[in-house]
Amino acid sequence: MAEKEITIAISRHRGLAPKAFEETYPSYGNQDQAGDMRNISLLDPNVMTQGPGMAELTNGDQGGVVTTLMRGILRQAVTSNVSYAFGGAKLYQFSASTVSSGGSPSWPRTVSDDGAEVGEDIAHYQSALYYSYNQTGSIGTIGRYDLASTFDDDYWDSGTPAAADLQSAPHQMVNGGDDVLYIANGRYIASLDGTTGNDQALDFPQNTQTASVTWNNNRLIAAVNRPAISGVNQNLSSVYKWNGVDASWEGQPIEINGRLGALYTKNGVTFVWYEGFLDGVVKLIFGLLAGGRVQPLRTFSGSLPLYYQVGELFDYIVWLSSGRLFAYGPLGGEIEVDLFQLMSPQYTNTAGGIASPFGEMLIASNDGGSNYSLERESGYATDSYYKTMLFEPSLGSLKSILDRLEIQCNKLATGAGVDLDLVDNKGNTLWSDSLSFTSDGAVTKKVFFPRAHGENMRLEYDFSAGSSTNPVEIKKTLLQGKNVAFG
């Protein structure tokens, strides 16, 4: 059989392939997609590069003032360069660079009511700050800070609203377009209309729990699990819509065979994260609400994101799963969308909340013990890697030889570097080399001649020997070779 030329051209390095979470060496998908990655940025569609590194804010750990895991992080600034977060029994104030310490009032502030306070969410509503939490006695409540000097930790039931205690449950809060603050409250939706509180503004069936709420199209949208239990279970959950006025929800809820984690609305589109059974196995699913149904977009693996672990960054939807931040987008429609794992906090053991009130991503995390952190983007990650799909160019009785590899990149700067490996699906390294400023200078292209033999192989980019200040920005990859007879 005559030799056959092989050309594998990657003009734009894409996000994770459809089966990337299910197989070690996925081969299904487009050849420009990834089989695996860690801390990789595709935010600039022109290049594949190291994802953002992360660094603690000043005072942003247990050696400073952060001694609890923050859940609710306000998604916007309240005043110039000032926002807030809530976790455990601590209410935090922070800027883009520093978690506040001391001052008047003194920060962080310890919330105190009936004991064992566990912070849930935080909201800016009608010129005041509201913070929801659970506490001793299987109850919840909401505190209020006037953004000057006065705190009322038991505002919901002992202050002006004089409402009944909330249930012990997730208490996400969302500002409605009708100028009402809506609160998830177990099998109910609670509401705060100015100073009028209602712990049961809307009720759902027995044995349910509201996991997340959002506002879209002048309606409250609620993700409600039934039964209200965690773990791998065949739940019959629903997404409800409510106009905030009627005694019941609108129309038929969207039923989901699985457990709902979170809702998030961006630009008039509501996205949903849930856990369900597909192909006989449990999968995590990211989708959107469309026409009275859920339209799945991608499956992924890890932990199910909760309401405080989803958000947005530029034109991307982002979420935490198993302690790592994923991004999906861009949503503008001009470029094909991708799913990629963008960045990771220093602790992936226990994930807290995320938000970008100042334009950069903030992530709270905990090591499972006494170490806590609030981090922001800083430089570039050096524990990054990107692995292509598995290429299977062999034909019949012929074997593949890849004898030319061309890497195009933006001009290298001091310290920039990436190690390259061709690996087969048995884990054998068929060839290794590197591209670096130290060895190659300020180049924009390098050609290698691997002469790597195999039935299949993939290209792996390892940035661990690179720089946290000068990244390698890969533009294009070209692999060329031929199929030849065995022997």
Predicted regions and their residues:
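A short acidic, glycine/proline-enriched capping/turn motif at secondary-structure boundaries
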Residues: 129, 136-137, 188-189
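Predominantly extracellular/luminal cell-surface or secreted proteins
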Residues: 94-96, 132, 140, 144-147, ...
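Short beta-strand motif characteristic of blades in beta-propeller domains
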Residues: 85, 131-132, 182-183, 222, ...
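Beta-propeller and closely related beta-pinwheel folds
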Residues: 57-74, 99-123, 146-179, 183-312, ...
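Beta-sheet repeat architectures centered on beta-propellers
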Residues: 2-90, 98, 117-119, 124-127, ...
